[in-house]
Curated annotation (Swiss-Prot):
This is Urease accessory protein UreG 2. GO terms for molecular function: GTP binding; GTPase activity; nickel cation binding. Belongs to the SIMIBI class G3E GTPase family. UreG subfamily. GTP binds at residues 22-29. Facilitates the functional incorporation of the urease nickel metallocenter. This process requires GTP hydrolysis, probably effectuated by UreG. The gene is ureG2. Keywords: Chaperone, Cytoplasm, GTP-binding, Nickel insertion, Nucleotide-binding. It is found in: Cytoplasm. Homodimer. UreD, UreF and UreG form a complex that acts as a GTP-hydrolysis-dependent molecular chaperone, activating the urease apoprotein by helping to assemble the nickel containing metallocenter of UreC. The UreE protein probably delivers the nickel. GO terms for cellular component: cytoplasm. Pfam families: cobW. Its main location: cytoplasm. It comes from the Bacteria. GO terms for biological process: urea catabolic process.
Amino acid sequence: MSRLALTRADEPMTAARVGIGGPVGSGKTALVERLIPALQTRGIDIAVITNDLVTAEDAERVRRSGLIDPERVSAVEAGACPHTVIREDPTLNIEAADELERRFPGVELILLESGGDNLASTFSRDLTDFWMFVIDVAGGDDIPRKRGPGVIRADLLVINKVDLAPHVGVDLGRMQREATEVRGGRPVLLTNCRRGEGIEAIVDLLEREVLFRK
């Protein structure tokens, strides 16, 4: 059960926290950079948390992008095991999210990008209300068949870099079909973050399933 579902009627509603996980190089940060303006265009007040092993590289990239007030971007150094701070002990990320909410009381949604990990990466429900897992076609169309916890359990599976499919010999239709099958019909969306394709469909889903606007 998500944090939002556990909020009592007499408690102030906190910002929705949306996790973004996936392997190294799948396009998580590129997705964050596409989601920021798409969410802002719809009037959604947002903030961002990024996780890296021992640096703030992704946070600095987002801050330099000019897409969002740099003060609204927080960095968490995850150490050697990026999954630990989003699953086993998410304290650092919870504290970072709480601090962003204190500093920006109107924030409605926090994008929380994990450090690059493997197909077993998942988010604690103590940390996120909704989480998506990003894979890319360059990793091969057999990724869904491997049934990693990230692929199966995520609220949304994003298949990114779809423009590369013909260049790496991937049957995109088969990949999407098999992903939907192993996920029991839960949503699978295709994106090309380099060109911004598929982003609006993700925002539609977040508005409907997380912010309950539709």
